């Protein structure tokens, strides 16, 4: 089995355009992946096209780790969210093909089932909205994002609305310097925040 085509599909949406990847093989099996990056979808699509030509087409799609390494190490410069998003989209599609080839869900190829149910959370910016989502619609928790200086007041309002039997999360989208993010996390701790997503940008070590 060999990869014969890698094609991207750009789906226009309101807030963010979605970029999907379709990998086709000579046996007719196809796999799908998703590689959306807000406002950078055309750059990711171009990167996918380059990766496909250099490292994917003609390869056995079941050699997923080999293809991943070739995509990652193909040039002198590597990394960055454009490159890694492109790799991710293709990688997902290859795993999709593998699952279809072996006739098992992909999670079985990754080690099997860990749990038989999942929590489901959504986004809220006010206490009233959070209460409705958690206690009337049944979500297990809510995630919020506030600029520096406003987060603690928002967390207090939301925690009082949903109580401590529901989970609370924060996402800063990597927009703050490390020192300010540290302040935010200290302020969030008293409200039982379960996780603090992207406190700094991916390039900040």
Regions found by a protein language model. Give the residues of each.
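Conserved, mostly hydrophobic/aromatic
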Residues: 3, 28, 52, 90, ...
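Metal-dependent enolase-superfamily TIM-barrel catalytic cores that perform enediolate-based chemistry
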Residues: 111-205
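Conserved active-site and cofactor/substrate-binding residues in soluble primary-metabolism enzymes
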Residues: 16, 43, 47, 59-62, ...
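Alpha-helical scaffold segments in soluble metabolic enzymes
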Residues: 50, 89, 96-97, 108, ...
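Metal- or metallocofactor-binding catalytic centers and their adjacent structured scaffolds
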Residues: 26-101
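Structured beta-strand/loop patches that form or line metal/cofactor-binding pockets in enzymes
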Residues: 1-32, 36-37
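Generic structural "secondary-structure junction" signal
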Residues: 5, 11-13, 58, 92, ...
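Glycine-rich, aromatic-flanked loop segments that form ligand/cofactor-binding clefts
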Residues: 91-123
């Amino acid at each position: 089995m060999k990869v014969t085509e890698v094609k991207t599909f750009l789906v226009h949406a309101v807030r963010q355009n979605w970029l999907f990847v379709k990998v086709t093989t000579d046996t007719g099996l196809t796999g799908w992946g998703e590689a959306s990056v807000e406002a950078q979808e055309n750059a990711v699509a171009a990167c996918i096209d380059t990766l496909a030509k250099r490292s994917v087409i003609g390869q056995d799609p079941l050699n997923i780790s080999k293809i991943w390494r070739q995509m990652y190490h193909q040039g002198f410069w590597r990394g960055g969210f454009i490159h890694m998003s492109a790799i991710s989209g293709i990688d997902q599609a290859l795993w999709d093909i593998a699952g279809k080839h072996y006739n098992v869900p992909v999670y079985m190829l990754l080690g099997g089932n860990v749990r038989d149910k999942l929590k489901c959370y959504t986004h809220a910016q006010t206490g009233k909205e959070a209460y409705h989502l958690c206690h009337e619609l049944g979500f297990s928790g809510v995630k919020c994002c506030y600029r520096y200086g406003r987060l603690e007041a928002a967390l207090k309002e939301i925690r009082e609305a949903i109580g401590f039997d529901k989970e609370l999360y924060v996402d800063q989208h990597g927009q703050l310097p490390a020192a300010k993010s540290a302040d935010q996390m200290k302020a969030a701790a008293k409200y039982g925040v379960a996780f603090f997503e992207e406190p700094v940008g991916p390039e900040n070590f």
